[in-house]
Swiss-Prot record:
Gene Ontology biological-process annotations: thiamine diphosphate biosynthetic process; thiamine metabolic process
Enzyme Commission number: 2.7.1.89
Record lineage: Bacteria, Pseudomonadati, Pseudomonadota, Gammaproteobacteria, Enterobacterales
Pathway field: Cofactor biosynthesis; thiamine diphosphate biosynthesis; thiamine phosphate from thiamine: step 1/1
Pfam families given in the database record: APH (PF01636)
Function, in words: Catalyzes the ATP-dependent phosphorylation of thiamine to thiamine phosphate. Is involved in thiamine salvage.
KW Transferase (keyword) present: yes
Source organism superkingdom: Bacteria
Chain segments annotated as transmembrane: none
Catalytic activity reported: thiamine + ATP = thiamine phosphate + ADP + H(+)
Family statement: Belongs to the thiamine kinase family.
Protein name per its UniProtKB record: Thiamine kinase
Organism the protein comes from: Escherichia coli O1:K1 / APEC
Uppermost EC category: transferase
Amino acid sequence: MPFRSNNPLTRDELLSRFFPQFHPVTTFNSGLSGGSFLIEHQGQRFVVRQPHDPDAPQSAFLRQYRALSQLPACIAPKPHLYLRDWMVVDYLPGEVKTYLPDTNELAGLLYYLHQQPRFGWRITLLPLLELYWQQSDPARRTVGWLRMLKRLRKAREPRLLRLSPLHMDVHAGNLVHSASGLKLIDWEYAGDGDIALELAAVWVENIDQHRQLVNDYATRAKIYPAQLWRQVRRWFPWLLMLKAGWFEYRWRQTGDQQFIRLADDTWRQLLIKQ
């Protein structure tokens, strides 16, 4: 249920008001975006989440709640509470592995997601690319970065192949291997976009795994694999710029050195793929 409040609650206020019988169990700090914590009462568990980006508008957090509210429970956690700066969702029991599942299994999950009703808001990358440029450390802004940004602005985003609801942050740490199948967590970047954009954004281990994932998806979607791969490749410069810009943005926000290393690595990939 959504709950409106002008003043954000503290963690203790949240628990005492809405979950008085629950107690915190553990904190999750995995991933690049931040942490959440687990609460429990008599075997029932919920995950309590906060916005990963403290500077993002509250509307972005609300969109995540709305996305989870309309997704089937077989692929995503069901939300139970939304209010300013807090969201409470089901805990998904299962294993989070350090590597991606079989490409055919992952393709099946993504294809099923892409058959769901659209969320109602579009993913547009150019505003994000420009935001990350503006909000990055001025000392890190380069002529090459600006040149690539102008090039993409002039080229415009690739034409859509198929418009579907997307997760947009598919990597091993966001996949729960449950008894009933694969499920996705961390839906903060979800929105409607090109299916090829989703496939391009998957954090794969190598090009062979990426090609196999696209081929397996193409079989399910009844698309020529070569056609789908070409569309995926069209999104590569956009995705690499998005990742590099996000890492730069997070570096300025947090001062965490891991973001500088990741940004530098992504810039190198971008040069290779140009």
